[in-house]
A protein has these predicted regions:
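Core mixed alpha/beta domains of very large multi-subunit molecular machines
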Residues: 1-184
Length: 184
């Protein structure tokens, strides 16, 4: 899976649509706090790296942390954590790239079973441990690239037994108006 980041365009559109700037600032502050604990707290380091799915080379770092290697005594581990933190802080400060912990970048597909109603979507995501979970409730869906306020929608994620085989994608309905498929 790919983690979700808000970029300048999406932040601008969400702000235009009424999302308070304080929301973005709070998310940024929480991320900076987590990154500051990266070098001092093992749990923060593992959580930050796993959540952002930093790539294959960082799996080794997570395995070393879980195995109990000391961050301040292992030069490779320390340098990898510092590089990860520097890259993440750079993304936040210079590119306004805000990590969304519960967000995902998903490919959209059509509900061939015709189970979903207009305004509903089906989302089932996988975790790093291989477990699956179905998302339910209101979700914010944005097209990429996101250039127009209509590219951001709030839809309702529902469970559908006939779509359980669909993983790490967002399933749009074939019923009703096609705006939520063609405009997203």
């Amino acid at each position: 899976f790919l983690p979700c980041y808000l970029n300048r365009q999406i932040i601008t559109l969400l702000s235009t649509l009424g999302v308070e700037d304080q929301v973005f600032e709070t998310i940024q502050e929480e991320r900076i706090t987590l990154l500051n604990g990266l070098l001092n707290e093992r749990f923060s380091a593992v959580e930050a790296i796993q959540a952002s799915y930093a790539g294959e080379c960082h799996k080794v770092v997570v395995e070393m942390l879980v195995a109990g290697y000391a961050r301040n005594r292992e030069p490779f581990l320390s340098s990898m954590l510092q590089a990860f933190k520097a890259a993440q802080v750079y993304q936040i400060c210079k590119r306004s790239r805000i990590f969304i912990p519960n967000g995902r970048v998903l490919m959209g597909c059509l509900d061939e079973t015709a189970d979903l109603a207009y305004g509903e979507v089906f989302i089932q995501i996988s975790a790093s441990d291989g477990s699956l979970s179905v998302i339910q409730g209101n979700v914010v869906v944005a097209k990429n690239p996101c250039l127009h306020p209509g590219d951001v929608r709030v839809l309702v994620a529902v469970d559908s037994p006939n779509l359980q085989h669909m993983v790490d994608c967002i399933v749009f309905p074939q019923n009703g108006n096609w705006w939520c498929v063609f405009h997203i």
